[in-house]
Amino acid sequence: MIESFDVIVVGGGPAGGQTARQLTKAGHKVLLAERYSSFEDNNFSSAGMTLEPLTEFNLPEKVVGRYWKNLVIQCSKDAYTWTSNEAKGVVLDFGRLRQFLADESVENGGKVLMGHRYAKKTLQDDGVLVDFIDSKTSKNIQFKTKLLVDATGPVRKVMYDNKDDQPMMVLGSGIEYLIKVSQEIYDQYKDDLVFFLGHKWALKGYSWIFPMENRILKVGAGKVHIEAKDQDKTNKTTKKLTEKVIKDYLKTDDYEIIDVHGGTLRYSPSIRDTFYKDRVVAVGDAVSTVNPLGGEGIRYAMQSANLACEYIDDFLKTGKNNFKSYRKKWRSKNLLKWQICEVSSKRVYIKYTDEQIENRMRFYHQTADFDEILNALFYFRFRKILLRIFQVYKVKLSYMLSGKKF
C-alpha cells in the first residue's frame, strides 16, 4: 500500500526545510525528500547575513559558523571598510542549518527521506502520486500527497515538467573554496565580511572572503548575467578568480582545501515564476527569492516558505485554494526592491568601469554610515542610499564639467 502524506516537500534546502518544519509544527503529516545522502553534500551557500534572521526564524547557536563585525569592500585599487565593536551578522554553516531544519521536522512528527531524487509526479483527482529514485540502488519508490512543494531551487524540477515551460531566466554561477589557513592569516579576517568589486578581483559579479570557525575561510567568486552555453567557461573563470584571491590577496600558498562547491542560479526577472499549479506549490529559489544584487538567498527563501505555509495550512484545513494570493502577496512585498536590485546589478557588475566603481565606493564610504550600508545591502532599504545617489549625480556633473569620468 502506498504511504500517503498531507504534504511532500522535494528539496532539503532552507526553503524546503523551513516548509517541513512549519507544517509539521502545525500538525500536518509531511515528508521531506532530499536527493543527497547527507546535508553536508552540495554545500553550496556562502550563507552570510545579518543578525536578524537568527531571531526571525528562531535559529540556534549551533548553525552559526562565525559572527562578523566589519564590512570590507575591496575594489581594484582601494579597500573601503566599515567597522563595529559589536557583531553585525553571522556566516551560517549551511549543512548544519539544513540538518537542524530536518531534525526539527522529525521532532514534530515528520519524516525525512535522504538519498532519493525526484523522478515524476502524476496528478489525480484527490492528490498527487510522486515517484522518487534511490540514488544508490536506482530503485523506485512512490508516495501519495495532497500537496507537493517544489523546493528544488533554481532547477524548478517539480513545478515544470518541461524546461521550455519556464519563464525567461537570467543565469548566475559561482564557486566557493572552503580552506584551512594559518592562524596568522585567519586572525586577519576572522571578523570581516570581505567583498571584491572591479575587474582585478571579479568579472561581471563579485568575489568574497567569509570567516567560519577557527582557521577556516570561505573564498569564492560569482558571475551574473551569463548565457547557458558559456557555463563551462564561466566555471573556469570563477575558479581562477577564487584562486587569485587566495594567492594574491590572502598571499598564501600554504592552505588546505577542505571542500570545493558551486552552483548555478536561475532567476526570473521581475519574479514572473509560477507559484502554484496543479497541487504544486513553489518556494525559495524556485520562485526567484535569491536577491539579484547581492545574491543573498537564505533569509528570503525561508520567508517565502513561511508565507507559503500559511496558504498550505489553510488549504489542508478548509480545502480553499488561495494560492494566487500567495504569489500576489510575495510580489507586492518584494517586486519593487527586486527590480531596483536588477537595475543596480547590471550597472555595478556589467556597465561600470573600475574607475566608476571606485569613485562610487569612495563616495559612499565618505557619506554613509555602517547601518545605512547594511540596510541597502541586506534589507534593500534604499531611501537613504537614494538620497546619496542624488548626491552622486551632483558630483558626477561636476566631474563631467571638469572633463573627468565619475
Where are the model-predicted features located?
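N-terminal Rossmann-fold NAD(P) dinucleotide-binding loop
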Residues: 16-17
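Conserved N-terminal glycine-rich FAD pyrophosphate-binding loop of Rossmann-like flavoproteins
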Residues: 36-59
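A conserved beta-strand/loop capping segment in the N-terminal third of enzymes
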Residues: 52-100
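Glycine-rich FAD pyrophosphate-binding loop
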Residues: 8, 24-43
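C-terminal helical "tail/cap" subdomain of flavin- and related membrane-associated enzymes
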Residues: 310-406
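FAD/FMN-dependent oxidoreductases across multiple families
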Residues: 120, 225-311, 316, 324
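Predominantly flavin-linked oxidoreductase catalytic cores and closely associated redox partners
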Residues: 12, 107-252
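Beta1/beta-strand and adjacent pyrophosphate-binding region of the FAD-binding site
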Residues: 2-13
